[in-house]
Amino acid sequence: MDEPMELYLGVDPGRDKTGAALVWENGRIFKQEILPTDDFSRHLQQFLPEQPLAGCILGDGTTSKTMAAQLEKDFPQLPLFTVNEYGSTQEAKKLYWQLHPPKGWKRLLPTALLDAPSAVDGLAAVVLVQRYLRDKTIK
């Protein structure tokens, strides 16, 4: 019988909106969303699954210290790990186009020249978890 996989929460904090993602330990996305930064913990509570999480991976950007304090206060049982978020938005845009390949004439263009039609904060949170998992397996 297969062992159950662990699930990680990724958080890409921002001033107005924050990316949140749930990612399995094999790097596959369970779900991702963009949540309002105001009253984040309440919105996050609704986003979280019933099952326990293996940890929370937080990007180290501008508002990360405030977000870390809020997460530690509101979710004290959740281990918190900080990762470098440099370039995560660009990586998230690449991931967007992998998940949603361009159609029609846009498929002829390099995806680097295309803008994602929606915000990618949730996918940036996915990228943060995938970085953490990659670094964790290398060590």
For the regions a protein language model found, what residue spans apply to each?
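Phosphate- and other anionic-substrate recognition elements at nucleic-acid/protein interfaces
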Residues: D2-L9, R15-K139
